[in-house]
């Protein structure tokens, strides 16, 4: 029988000259890109977050590397990151054999809630300098992501207003039953129209309690019953006071929203795409808006609006505040097509490849415009009149201003036919009595006409095709590939911080994928060497400045 010779195996063998840990990491491994990129960032703003006295904290650059690399690998739990710092060679190398616990990691994330936004901006500018993006085109889209809060923690504005009115009526009835001069005076001074405040009820309850304490303990049965009744009424008054104070706090939290969650007061109840019961149940969440270019996230923001229409202008302003410039080209779907949005983009010199309602329907081969719809009537701009399908002239009778939820005023011109009685097309035209009246928004029609020209042009067709694989692909990768389907923190500031880490990790991961796909591993090494050299130069200059200050 042939003897089998196995390779020597001794896991407890002592090495005389230990090798460097990064020798077992491939040169084109993404962990090297994370290390190089973070080394090239300016983290001077992180210094103000630490105290000069006490125990020396972990280096923020090391903590940032570890968290970003964990997010790149779909690991968002601080406890799992702590385990990997003891087991995984990539995390051990990034941390330099440091082993912060999960509390320290989570505390660092919460500490850099504002500074991480600046890190994201630096990362995008670095991508722009390397030629991955130009920041001239912004593909915008939104998605609703569920909050960590429970779906049964809702507070509705209408319910609060209705219950507050009922409580006011109960208070008036209760004060009418209390046999006390002070209570009667307060009740007469404050009728149902004026209402009460928690401070008034607290004052009244205190005076009534003081009056009851002055009364000696009665001996008769009827007097005991009456005293017991008054104490019960006092207890009810105090309960109404507490409830009224609770109802008065709700509008401050709601502000312009119609709902919020008790456990996550920044979350708004919305209908999500993931509806397992198919009953349209609302869940607490945020409307996440992102801007992408070449499938890199260039900007992001969180909004309480369930729809996308009111988010476009503040989102474009967010892009301007971040990069001190406006995007030259904006591409978005029909959810953003409104007069206010078109006007803002036109005034800021943007090319708006933004669809409007019924745009896709108009592009169908079998589409035929309905001649009886007001927007399809012939309009004479010179003499300001419309012509109905029967050929009758419709004269201008006035203007109606419509105020939107954002406060913008739409001007709708009103036109009315002279005589619709006996018209053979009346049954198909309208069903109301009298002569037909229509409203037209001429400014919006001009914006739609301009948008249609841009969207149907050769450049517009290219942007329309690109939009389908820009933000939609990013959302698909975030939700399915990176398993980021629900926020893991309470509060808008913490949710924003968590997604900022994810956006940075996503951009680094995308950059590594693009370089590796093109077989440009040598570029990764070059990028590593350049960023490391820049960081060393910046550190040397900063050290010299500190020495001058110390001198």
Predicted regions and their residues:
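Hydrophobic alpha-helical membrane-insertion signals
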Residues: 1-32
């Amino acid at each position: 029988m042939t003897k089998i010779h196995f390779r020597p195996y001794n896991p407890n063998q002592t090495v005389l000259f230990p090798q460097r840990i990064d020798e077992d990491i491939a040169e084109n491994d993404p962990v090297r890109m994370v290390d190089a990129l973070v080394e090239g960032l300016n983290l001077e703003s992180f210094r103000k977050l630490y105290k000069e006295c006490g125990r020396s904290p972990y280096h923020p650059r090391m903590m940032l590397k570890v968290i970003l690399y964990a997010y790149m690998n779909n690991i968002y739990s601080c406890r799992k990151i702590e385990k990997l710092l003891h087991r995984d060679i990539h995390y051990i190398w990034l941390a330099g054999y440091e082993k912060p616990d999960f509390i320290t990691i989570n505390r660092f994330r919460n500490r850099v809630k504002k500074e991480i936004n600046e890190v994201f901006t630096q990362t995008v500018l670095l991508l722009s300098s390397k030629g991955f993006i130009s920041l001239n085109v912004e593909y915008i889209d939104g998605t609703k992501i569920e909050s960590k809060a429970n779906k049964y923690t809702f507070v509705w504005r209408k319910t609060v207003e209705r219950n507050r009115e009922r409580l006011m009526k109960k208070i008036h009835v209760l004060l009418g039953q209390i046999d006390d001069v002070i209570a009667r005076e307060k009740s007469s001074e404050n009728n149902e129209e004026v209402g009460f405040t928690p401070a008034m009820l607290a004052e009244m309850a205190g005076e009534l309690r003081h009056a009851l304490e002055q009364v000696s303990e009665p001996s008769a049965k009827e007097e005991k019953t009456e005293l017991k009744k008054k104490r019960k009424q006092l207890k009810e008054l105090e309960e109404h006071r507490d409830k009224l104070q609770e109802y008065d706090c709700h509008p401050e939290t709601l502000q312009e929203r119609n709902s919020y969650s008790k456990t996550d007061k920044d979350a708004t109840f919305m209908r999500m795409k993931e509806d397992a019961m198919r009953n349209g149940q609302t869940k607490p969440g945020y409307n996440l808006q992102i801007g992408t270019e070449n499938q890199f996230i260039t900007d992001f923001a969180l909004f309480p609006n369930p729809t996308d229409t009111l988010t476009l202008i503040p989102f474009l302003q967010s892009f301007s505040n971040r990069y001190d410039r406006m995007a030259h080209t904006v591409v978005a779907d029909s959810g953003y097509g409104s007069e206010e949005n078109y006007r803002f983009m036109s005034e800021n010199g943007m090319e708006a490849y933004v669809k409007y309602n019924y745009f896709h329907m108009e592009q169908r081969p079998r589409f035929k415009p309905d001649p009886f719809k007001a927007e399809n009537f012939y309009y004479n701009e010179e003499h300001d009149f419309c012509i109905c399908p029967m050929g009758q002239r419709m004269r201008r009778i006035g203007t109606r201003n419509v105020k939107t939820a954002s406060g913008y005023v739409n001007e709708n011109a009103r036109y009315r036919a002279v005589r619709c009685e006996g018209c053979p097309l009346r049954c198909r035209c309208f069903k109301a009595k009298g002569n037909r009246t229509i409203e037209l928004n001429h400014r919006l029609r001009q914006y739609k006409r301009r948008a249609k020209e841009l969207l149907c042009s050769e450049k517009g067709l290219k942007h329309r095709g690109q939009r389908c694989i820009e933000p939609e692909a990013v959302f698909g990768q975030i939700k399915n590939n990176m398993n980021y389907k629900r926020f893991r923190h309470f509060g808008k500031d913490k949710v924003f911080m968590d997604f900022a880490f994810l956006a940075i990790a996503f951009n680094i991961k995308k950059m590594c994928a693009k370089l590796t796909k093109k077989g440009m591993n040598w570029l990764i090494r070059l990028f590593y060497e350049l960023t490391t050299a820049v960081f060393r130069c910046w550190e040397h200059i900063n050290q010299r400045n500190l020495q001058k200050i110390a001198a």
